């Protein structure tokens, strides 16, 4: 998260103090044989730079009631909204956020989270009860498509999954609990 404009606040923009020339930095790493993957998530925070645009254009599904925050940045409940991948305009908006990064030379996006959505939100294309498991597939598909379009290689670094996600490589089994229940 050290690349974020604001620590732990995903706005799909580099911190200008740490990275005054992100494109130059990425290109310098590339010349040394490194490839850059950036961590991000599919939720927009209340104080994110994009919140007004996201709400105005229905890029995040509007909530039907006020959510109680858990006080951390590790749950959809802590964010103002979930990007609505059932809405094509929201998907294109998200792809545009990633395209800006990929155009700088980023080669892979870590599509973290996606296993939780706001269950009290009004998604344009599907009821939340049906979308809940399918969400990871739609999320990874969007990131995969724009990555393939820009870089020529369709690679994402995904954690959450649902049937069909295997067509959008690569997946890792991280963040699982070290318990018998966590392995279920």
Where are these regions (language model features)?
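Catalytic-domain carbohydrate-binding cleft regions of carbohydrate-active enzymes
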Residues: 1-184
């Amino acid at each position: 998260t050290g690349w974020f404009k604001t620590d732990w606040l995903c706005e799909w923009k580099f911190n200008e103090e740490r990275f005054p020339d992100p494109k130059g930095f990425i290109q310098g790493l590339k010349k040394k044989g490194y490839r850059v993957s950036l961590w991000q998530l599919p939720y927009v925070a209340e104080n994110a730079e994009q919140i007004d645009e996201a709400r105005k254009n229905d890029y995040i599904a509007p909530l039907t009631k006020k959510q109680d925050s858990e006080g951390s940045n590790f749950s959809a409940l802590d964010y103002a909204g979930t990007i609505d991948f059932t809405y094509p305009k929201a998907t294109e908006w998200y792809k545009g956020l990633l395209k800006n990064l990929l155009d700088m030379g980023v080669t892979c996006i870590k599509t973290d989270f996606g296993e939780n959505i706001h269950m009290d939100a009004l998604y344009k294309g599907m009821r939340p009860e049906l979308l809940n498991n399918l969400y990871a597939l739609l999320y990874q598909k969007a990131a995969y498509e724009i990555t393939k379009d820009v870089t020529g290689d369709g690679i994402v670094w995904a954690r959450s999954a649902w049937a069909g996600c295997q067509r959008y490589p690569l997946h890792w089994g991280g963040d699982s609990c070290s318990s018998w229940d966590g392995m279920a």
